[in-house]
Regions:
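Feature captures the catalytic ectodomains and active-site-proximal regions of enzymes
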Residues: 1-244
Length: 244
């Protein structure tokens, strides 16, 4: 199997771990990735083979400018134009029968940087109850503004959960991570995951954002985000064509 990713993320720790068993094909432009993909489809080294091609531009424009912006719309249009010109057309001419699946790994919720609730600023009383590392620094934040995970001292967990549930009423759900594990949100939770994951998670409602503030380190500048459990984030498209 082959993974085509932007050279900006192809060699990240996450990519190396997730794609360890595949051949990584870094690219500088999406059009060049599609050209390489077609070449591989027309001249496979072995069959069957699988190719995964990831385009981050649509996601990036959504984050930076919002999903109602022209930047986002143009990124979607440009994506399909490039696919038509650099994938569909040359592949049709080749006569190769290649099954193709299109999907987005998530949707998005609009968020407003100016209306983001910064948990540590809004409720500083919870800070002493959070776990710290060996250097005495609070273990926060984890996740994102759409799924903020907190490492709470076990003896304070229920107290903090109850406090935040009241304070965030109408803004977010506050859920024990163990409850989500039992309900299958993390699949089969490995022992390592259970040891490392935070024990409390804040899941903002649609259009809400809850994050952590540290100037020039942790700030919320996005106009759309994902990670929560709203249908707009969780549901996606899946287009399958048996062959071109």
């Amino acid at each position: 199997s082959y993974v085509f990713q932007s050279d900006k993320i192809a060699h990240s720790s996450y990519s190396k771990a997730l794609c360890a068993a595949a051949t990584m094909v870094p690219y500088t432009t999406f059009s060049s990735a599609l050209d390489s993909l077609v070449d591989l489809c027309c001249n496979p080294k072995q069959t069957p083979f699988y190719c995964f091609v990831y385009l981050a531009d649509i996601d990036s424009m959504g984050h930076r400018y919002g999903i109602a912006s022209d930047f986002f719309s143009n990124a979607v249009i440009d994506c399909w134009k490039l696919i038509e010109n650099h994938y569909w057309t040359p592949l049709r001419k080749s006569g190769k029968r290649i099954a193709t699946l299109f999907t987005a790994d998530h949707g998005m919720s609009p968020v407003d940087p100016d209306k983001t609730l910064y948990l540590n600023n809004s409720f500083p009383s919870i800070l002493p109850a959070l776990k710290k590392d060996t250097q005495g620094r609070i273990l926060a934040p984890s996740g994102s503004c759409r799924d903020l995970f907190l490492h709470v001292q076990e003896e304070k967990l229920l107290e903090i959960a109850s406090f935040l549930e009241k304070k965030l009423k109408g803004i977010a759900d506050v859920v024990l991570t163990k409850k989500m594990m039992k309900e299958g949100f993390f699949g089969v939770a490995s022992e390592r995951l259970q040891q490392r994951i935070a024990n409390l998670v804040i899941l903002p409602y649609y259009k809400e954002a809850v994050w952590w503030f540290e100037k020039n380190r942790f700030e919320q500048h996005f106009f759309a985000a994902h990670g929560g459990l709203t249908p707009q984030e969780m549901e996606s498209i899946c287009l399958f064509l048996p062959h071109v």
